[in-house]
Structure formats: structure tokens, C-alpha cells
Amino acid sequence: MISDLKSSRGVDEPTIIVLKSRRIVVVFRGFNVISKNWNTRIRMGTPPHKWFTFSDDGGRTFSEPVPWRYENGEVFYSPASISRFFRSVVNGKAYWFGNITGPEAYGYSPRYPLVMAEVDEEKGFLKKETYTLVEDRDPETESEELQLSNFSLLEDRETGSIELYLTKLGAYREDRWRGDAYRYTIEVG
């Protein structure tokens, strides 16, 4: 549970990973939109976060959800968008893929850039020094409604590469539901 003063529609779309420390980490998307129809109590200017909770007792109990952060304690911002944990079979490292934005993100937007970062195996925070840009919006050719979210991940068992599949919805200014599909190959070695 999370207060509607922190996330106006609760939390949803969890991504879960078990760390090498045996800690279970769950990261959810939150929502910072004010809506009369939903009778929200959240305040204007509430920053957008991914929400973080963990269990050190095998999932019997979980901590109170808090804004997720880098391992140095710095909080980052993220819109209401799907994210994914992924553990590489090749190097055993845990990664997170998702959108990291500035504090101005509101609701679902913007859903760019798409980034990845390694997850600290002890506590479950992101290692800022591993932040890697996967894709970003081209302001010359792509709409501000671009969505670099709703992607799929798999690992090529022969090469060990991570393959990310993404349809760039909203890329075309004249048709927000039109989007081209892309495959990104990420070497993690």
C-alpha cells in the first residue's frame, strides 16, 4: 500500500528481482496526476518516481514503499511507465531498463529517454556510474508524445547479448498511434 498523497493511483506494473544478497526487490510505477474524476488528493508538483520496496525475509514482509534512488542516495525521477529488471546469464549482473526523466515529468510523460543501469546486489539501488542511454527522442523528427516504453527483453543464448524490442509509438507528429518497431542489441560481456 502507498498513500494517495504520494501516488494518486497507487502503484502498479511491478518488476521483481532476487538479488545475490537474497533480498527481494520490487519496483513499481507511481502516478502524480491530479484528477477530479479520481478524487485525487496528491498535490501539484509532487515529483514522479519509481517506488521501491524490499523483503529480507523471503517475501513474508516488505518495507514501506519509498522513492527509488541511486546507491549514492540521489533520488531520480521517472514517469508512470513500465520498467523491467533483467539478469544476464553471461555475467550474472542485474540490470534495470526504464525511463529516467527530470522532476517535471507529469503522469505518463515524457517516456524518454530509455536507459539501463546495473543494480547493486546488496541493497537493490541503481549504480549511477553504469547509467547507459539506450534510446532518446530526436527533437528534429519525433513528436513529444514519443513513447520509449512497453518494450520486451530477451537474451540471445548463443551470443549473450541482450535484445530489446520496442515500438516507437507517438514518433510521428501526424499520427500518434503509428510507430516503427526496432530491435536493439546490447553487449554486456
Task: Enumerate the predicted regions with their spans.
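Asp-box/BNR beta-propeller blade signature and adjacent active/binding-site loops
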Residues: 1-189
